[in-house]
Every structure is written in structure tokens, then in C-alpha cells.
């Protein structure tokens, strides 16, 4: 699902403007995602800037897609205008005003309001890096616009194939982009390593997304008017999109969701293999990957026995104590494939905590 190579317009931003953009990016990141703020902090120099920029651009697109209060055609048009802004500096400066009517999380809206600064960061990257970031953000945003237009009354995934397609657009693209950035900016990821990683990079991105979809079933249905569990699978177990959060159908719905938990487990195992293929010399890249992966395994473990994500107002979250324990254990284990496999097996089985770590 690739398109033409996009060559961004080259302009010269002042050093002061680039510093302002870098400060903004680093300050807004924890308001958008605490987990990725930690992970991106491990990445050095231009690689860190490239991943920070890419992540913020993806979250801008995601914020547009998720606003269920704005008309679908308006959101689709905003996504397309956002893509124009990636390549045209004048459009970049005008975009925040065009998107000012969006509703959503305060941190995400603050990010959208300074899209112009994020695009200054984009223009500060090496030329080839800019091209690859634009290529994959374009792939993501066009896919989002497609689903917004296909489901003007709220996304209602119908089949497993459509579920996979959606996950590719919103997350598989991220795995592809990150892998290209590892190759370009990390000497330890040469052509041979890149080719091996490329086979599983889409699964790496999609694995984390599928866990998020499963833990946020109720939130997405209530607050974003989006249901990603396919109608076909719900119907096979005697339920439907209309009864997804019905207490009377909770066991029917859990049987349908159990299949997607199994699929997510397979995806996560592919994502683990992806990480284990990253050369141990690329410690920063391993550090970036390990925490989201461990958190996803822990969340999926809890999802397997929970019904909370299928109740109004419910969600599934691992404890703060386990988060802190996994941060310590993950960073210690990441240098050894054997130790990391052991840790994953432990996390799959039961909550992982250190007795000395406070909640």
C-alpha cells in the first residue's frame, strides 16, 4: 500500500524557530502519552527528533479522526489538508486555525493548535527522513479519511479483514516508519538487519494497537462513537454492535472478543520476535521498544479474564506498581534475549511486581 515518493518543499527555518519547536515537542509529549514520552527519551540525537516528530504527527491525525462531534466530511477534509500542510509551509502555518473547532482531550488539542511547530521540526530533519515520515503519515491519514467517509455515522467495523485493514492504517504504518528510521539513523541496523526487521515491522505496530482497541472498547463506543470489534464476529456469538455494552449480552460479547484477544497474543509474539531481532548494540532502540511491549503483554493478560472493557465506563489498566516494576525489569532484561523471553513468560502468567516498588 505505497504511493509516490513525496518531496517536501525546502525552506529555511531560523535556528531560534527550530529551538522553539523542539522545546514545544518535548513539553507536549508527556501530555499526549506518558509511555511514549519515556520511550522516546531513550533515543539519541536526530533519531530521537525524527521519532518525536513522527509520533506527534500521527497523534495530530489521530485527534482529527477521533473527534466524533465534528462532521465526518469535515474531518476527512481536515486530514487531507493536514497532508498538504506536510509539504507546504504556508499551509502549515494556516492549519491550526482550520482545525480550531475540533473537540477532544486537552493535551491532544494543544498539540493540534501548534501543528505549525511540529512541521518546523519535520523540516529540520534530513531530507530523506522527511520523505519517509511524510510517506507513512500520508498512508495513515488517507486510510483514516477512508474509514471516516465509509462510516459517516461512526466507525462500525464489519469483518476481520476490515479490522486488519484498519489496524494497518493506524498502526502497521507506524511499525514500517520506525523500522526505516532505525535503518537510517542507527549504524547497528544495517541492510541485513533491516530486511529481517521489515518482515515483522507491520506486526510490531499493529500488536500495540490491537491491545489498545481491546482495552478501550467501552470508551471508544461511548466517547468516540467507534466500534472496532467486527459485526460478523459479534453476530456469530448472538450479539451486535447495538448490544456491545449490554449487561444481558456480556458473555456473548466476551466470547467474540476472546477471539481478538487470541489474535492480539499472536501479534504480540510477532512483535517480541521483532524486538529480539534488533541488534543488542542498538540499545537505545531496544529501550524504546521494550516498555510498550511489556505493558501490552500485561494488559492483554488482564483482558483475558476481565469483562470491564465491555461495561459502560469500564476499561482495563495494569497497576502503577506493575508499570514501575516492568520499567525496571524491562530495562535490565533488554540486553539479553533469553532474559527478555523469560520476563515475557512471567508477565503472561501473572502480575509482575517487585516488593520494594511502591504503588
Name these PLM-found stretches.
Residues 1-207, 214, 218-359:
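Catalytic cores of Mg2+-dependent Asp-rich isoprenoid enzymes
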Amino acid at each position: 500500500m505505497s504511493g509516490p515518493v513525496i518531496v517536501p518543499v525546502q525552506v529555511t527555518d531560523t535556528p531560534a524557530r527550530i529551538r522553539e519547536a523542539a522545546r514545544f515537542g518535548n513539553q507536549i509529549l508527556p501530555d499526549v502519552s506518558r509511555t511514549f514520552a519515556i520511550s522516546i527519551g531513550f533515543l539519541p540525537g536526530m533519531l530521537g527528533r525524527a521519532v518525536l516528530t513522527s509520533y506527534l504527527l500521527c497523534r495530530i491525525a489521530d485527534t482529527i479522526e477521533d473527534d466524533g462531534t465534528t462532521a465526518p466530511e469535515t474531518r476527512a477534509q481536515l486530514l487531507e489538508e493536514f497532508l498538504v500542510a506536510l509539504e507546504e509551509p504556508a499551509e502549515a502555518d494556516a492549519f491550526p486555525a482550520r482545525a480550531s473547532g475540533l473537540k477532544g482531550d486537552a493535551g491532544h488539542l494543544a498539540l493540534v493548535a501548534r501543528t505549525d511547530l511540529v512541521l518546523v521540526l519535520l523540516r529540520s530533519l534530513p531530507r530523506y527522513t522527511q520523505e519517509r515520515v511524510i510517506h507513512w503519515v500520508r498512508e495513515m491519514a488517507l486510510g483514516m479519511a477512508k474509514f471516516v467517509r465509509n462510516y459517516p455515522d461512526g466507525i462500525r467495523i464489519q469483518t476481520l479483514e476490515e479490522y486488519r485493514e484498519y489496524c494497518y492504517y493506524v498502526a502497521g504504518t507506524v511499525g514500517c516508519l520506525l523500522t526505516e528510521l532505525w535503518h537510517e539513523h542507527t549504524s547497528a541496523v544495517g541492510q541485513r538487519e533491516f530486511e529481517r526487521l521489515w518482515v515483522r515491522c507491520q506486526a510490531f505496530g499493529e500488536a500495540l494497537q490491537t491491545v489498545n482497541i481491546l482495552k478501550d472498547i467501552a470508551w471508544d463506543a461511548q466517547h468516540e462513537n467507534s466500534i472496532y470489534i467486527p459485526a460478523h464476529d459479534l453476530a456469530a456469538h448472538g450479539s451486535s454492535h447495538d448490544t456491545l455494552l449490554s449487561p444481558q449480552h456480556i458473555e456473548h460479547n466476551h466470547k467474540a472478543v476472546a477471539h481478538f484477544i487470541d489474535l492480539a497474543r499472536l501479534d504480540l509474539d510477532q512483535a517480541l520476535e521483532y524486538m529480539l531481532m534488533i541488534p543488542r548494540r542498538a540499545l537505545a532502540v531496544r529501550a524504546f521498544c521494550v516498555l510498550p511491549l511489556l505493558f501490552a503483554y500485561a494488559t492483554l493478560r488482564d483482558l483475558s479474564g476481565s469483562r470491564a472493557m465491555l461495561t459502560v465506563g469500564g476499561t482495563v489498566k495494569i497497576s502503577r506498581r506493575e508499570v514501575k516494576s516492568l520499567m525496571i525489569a524491562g530495562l535490565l532484561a533488554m540486553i539479553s534475549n533469553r532474559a527478555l523471553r523469560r520476563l515475557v513468560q512471567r508477565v503472561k502468567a501473572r502480575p509482575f511486581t517487585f516488593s520494594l516498588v511502591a504503588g
